[in-house]
Amino acid sequence: MKKNILNLALVGALSTSFLMAKPAHNANNATHNTKKTTDSSAGVLATVDGRPITKSDFDMIKQRNPNFDFDKLKEKEKEALIDQAIRTALVENEAKTEKLDSTPEFKAMMEAVKKQALVEFWAKKQAEEVKKVQIPEKEMQDFYNANKDQLFVKQEAHARHILVKTEDEAKRIISEIDKQPKAKKEAKFIELANRDTIDPNSKNAQNGGDLGKFQKNQMAPDFSKAAFALTPGDYTKTPVKTEFGYHIIYLISKDSPVTYTYEQAKPTIKGMLQEKLFQERMNQRIEELRKHAKIVINK
């Protein structure tokens, strides 16, 4: 349910899900073929059959996350990243030994990757040009005034929910809660959530459907609208439908809304307007290219 903002997985940029598998942890995990040294001269962090692994091997991560800095990582994080690079190099060497890089399938895959990389590189260059554009102060101020209530008000709610497949199931659960005295409604809600919810996170945790705290934009629109309309200690008397199914929502608490000032919101506004300008320029440029290209669509 909740749209968690996740940190970039450091090793994610280096390998496929196969390579991401954790190595077995045992006393012999560092085999006799693996030597640890303190020699990191010339930026060489490790070698695999003579091939050096350097900080530049992690440039792909920096492209995705500009804040990435290998030198600022904790020692265990560095070791994990280096180990992942070693695992990748080992498999790469094995693939070359098997001459997989000479197969038609691999060559076709590389062509597809090159095409996609070229498109992304072109788009990156366009984005860099857009960042140089100064967004007028008045345009940012007007955007803030027009969108203040929707985008720049922070308010968190803490709620529970029960998710079921059908509206009839949801109505039955609401009816069961309705029968309870006020002092016992939340306890009944927790009991029914643990028993009936199809939300896998809640079901596995057996936490009474506790979603923790969330903001409006972190939930499906209809869910947020219903949740934030409640008062603490109250629950939805009619099922709330979303793409996930039907919800019954119980509100535990709700913070008072806090509106960001223009100055606080300004960096976000600038980014949003730059993104809008980028999309407009991309569409405009592509239309120009379309006009000058010979395009044939076969039906």
Curated annotation (Swiss-Prot):
Catalytic activity annotation: [protein]-peptidylproline (omega=180) = [protein]-peptidylproline (omega=0)
Coiled coil: none
Molecular-function GO terms, alphabetical: peptidyl-prolyl cis-trans isomerase activity
Residue stretches making up the PpiC domain: 154-253
Keywords for the protein's UniProt record, in alphabetical order: Isomerase, Rotamase, Signal
Signal peptide stretch: 1-21
Superkingdom in the source lineage: Bacteria
InterPro entries noted in UniProt: PPIase_dom_sf (IPR046357), PPIase_PpiC (IPR000297), PPIase_PpiC_CS (IPR023058), PrsA_foldase (IPR050245), Trigger_fact/SurA_dom_sf (IPR027304)
Any matching Pfam family: Rotamase
EC number: 5.2.1.8
Protein name according to UniProt: Putative peptidyl-prolyl cis-trans isomerase HP_0175
Species whose genome carries this gene: Helicobacter pylori (strain ATCC 700392 / 26695)
